[in-house]
């Protein structure tokens, strides 16, 4: 049997504007919930971007670290 790797990218990184039809989690809690659901469905890797509460991309370490910690508490990703 051939093995595959399933990667999930829960946060759309298309600039400042998020398309209306796109479900895009913003908070670490929302991102974690999506990642955990994908993990349960077979995903084994996450490609992560974070956003602030206004929907803008953010590279703030505390937001990223909180999100990573929450994901690691609930998965082995």
Regions found by a protein language model. Give the residues of each.
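Conserved, mostly hydrophobic/aromatic
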Residues: 31, 38, 49
């Amino acid at each position: 049997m051939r093995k595959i790797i399933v990667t999930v990218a829960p946060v759309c990184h298309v600039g400042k504007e998020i398309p209306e039809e796109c479900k895009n989690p913003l908070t670490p809690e929302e991102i974690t919930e999506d990642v955990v659901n994908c993990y349960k469905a077979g995903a084994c890797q996450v490609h992560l971007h974070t956003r602030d509460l206004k929907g803008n991309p953010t590279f703030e370490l505390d937001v990223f670290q909180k999100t990573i910690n929450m994901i690691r508490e609930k998965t082995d990703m």
